[in-house]
């Protein structure tokens, strides 16, 4: 796919480390010729992101707290000073108090509910509003979601609710921005051992269950997600918007445990 993204520029938000879904997408975009900028939050995250940026020759890094609208404005102003226009944005952002990603959903506190919804769902709306101003010739906005938005996944709790809001936001934004030739889509990735996933209770059990019951009898990789991301952000998907695209080895089509799947314990 060398050259598929040649001449295109975009911002990747939420890259955490080399296990991130965003990293899988960033590598594919870079290999296809895209020019990238990264955003991160805080000095600790910068230490992780900067070496990755160097690997891909990314020179534009921005510290951005998406829950702070002034900080978000400053990030896009700084990006606009470098690039007057962009072609795509990857929104790979979500956060919740990990102590509430175990146990029962009704134990979610109001403060954590509001914070999780703000960072994990509303931030896409805020980002899209600002990205739109830098996409006079159209573009593509891509976010990341999970099957816990559609069905109950143990311990996913308030993140499932936030991802459901995120997925619905994708559809409303797709309508708002479609006339401007700006496409908005989401990738619903199967469970992968990422930094964010480590905070979910019994995650290894969820991972193994998916492996044993998905039609392809495996879990997905960041390379799988990266390939789908490249498609969604390139002109190959020029007629696609408002979609929740599953990259989960087919797990989302399964209605019950596979006949040949062994029983597994939580431990």
Where are the model-predicted features located?
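Canonical Rossmann dinucleotide-binding motif of NAD(H)/NADP(H)-dependent dehydrogenases/reductases
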Residues: 2-38
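Hydrophobic structural elements of the Rossmann-like NAD(P)H-binding subdomain
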Residues: 12, 90, 142, 184-187, ...
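Catalytic loop of short-chain dehydrogenase/reductase
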Residues: 14-23, 94-133, 137-179, 191-193, ...
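A short hydrophobic alpha-helix cap/turn motif
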Residues: 30, 84, 135-136, 175-180, ...
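Conserved glycine-rich Rossmann-like NAD(P)H-binding loop of the short-chain dehydrogenase/reductase
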Residues: 34-48
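A glycine/serine/threonine-rich, flexible loop-to-helix segment
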Residues: 50-51, 179, 189-214, 254-267
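Conserved mid-core segment of classical short-chain dehydrogenase/reductases
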Residues: 64-73, 77-84, 88-114, 133, ...
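C-terminal helical subdomain
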Residues: 122, 186, 205-240, 245-249
